[in-house]
Amino acid sequence: LGLMLQPNSYTDFNAHPEFDEVFKLWTQGDNFRGMDLARLWSLMLNIKHVLGSRSEGALAELGVYKGNSSAVLSHYARKFGRKMYLADTFVGFDSTQIEGETAVSDGKVAAFKDTSLELAKRVVGDYEGNRWCVGMFPDSISPEMRDDSFAFVSIDCDIYQPIAEGLQFFWPRMVPGGMIFVHDYSSGHWPGATQAVDEFRVREKVEGILLSDLSGTYALAKPGQ
């Protein structure tokens, strides 16, 4: 129990020879992430599938924190020759963003202040295709980002406002078949994440699937060929 088996494509056919390198990116400075192999493999398999079948579209993460999952996305952005947008305040939650978030305790607020732009850049690496968007979202959106299209987006902001803003911004810019992963949808710790996704589903008349990672990621795919 508690043991995550690796995909057959990896164990039997060595289809993902980059795994050891990506696992180091995923766990650097944060060994707890090594427990959530379901999330890592979900990212790896879906990113490779989308980028391998779509010739256009950048990657992005909204909610970079220390940069571990962004490092994984940036790895594949480099491999497939795509841009990678990284959006965060890099100082934790802004007070205006957590107004009305009844489940956000002082402890949760403090837990995300132990980062910085400099730390995230060290973790993610210096790929020339990285685009750093610093500040509150959507104010941090650059003209280049606004004009771009996206193939894969990770939204990991925990709270309602930036998740809702992120879905509103990225969805119309997704290429057909592109995917958005929203972390913490069914974790129980962040009801604002659930609310933002559910409102988006109703408004856009779309459905996705729940992934079985530790915090219950909700995965959306843009319709079309």
What kind of feature is each model-predicted range?
Residues 41-54:
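Conserved alpha-helix/loop element of class I SAM-dependent methyltransferases that forms part
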